[in-house]
Amino acid sequence: MVNHQLKVVQALASALTAGGRGVSGTAFPKQPEKSLKLYEFEGSPFCRRVREVLTLLNLDYEVYPCPKGGAKYRKIVKEKGGKLRFPFLIDENTGIEMYESKDIIDYLFKHYGKSGKTPKKYSDYPKYPVVALVGTLINGARGVWINQKIINREAPEQLLELWGF
């Protein structure tokens, strides 16, 4: 119970550090017909940026965790994109497969945002994501280090649903 409470406090502190990004969503979002697929790892500040925008746009998406040392989904990214770089987004609705958080964010607003334009708050990210990095550190840098306890854990039989942000 204490571990869970600590994670809740970490998540809140991380969200507040980022100026509240990732804590609200768009009403009546433009949902894609097929779920978007995001290959990412939790500790990456660049992946964090994409997750914040997916939350803001209130989009349903599938997350494929690719922590350091993980073998399950990293090979798919390498096969499809040619390199191990994260985040990696696949949108089967448009046939797009892409790297680079800034490009992904612009793409998401263009195709699924209300105006089709990336708001200034999300287009003017600094090159080095200091604030997002602080959020990663507050959250214990999960996904940055190899966790031997979970490295070969089997995937669940069906996708898990997360409600919240």
What are these regions (language model features)?
Residues 1-165:
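GST-like domain detector, emphasizing the conserved glutathione-binding G-site
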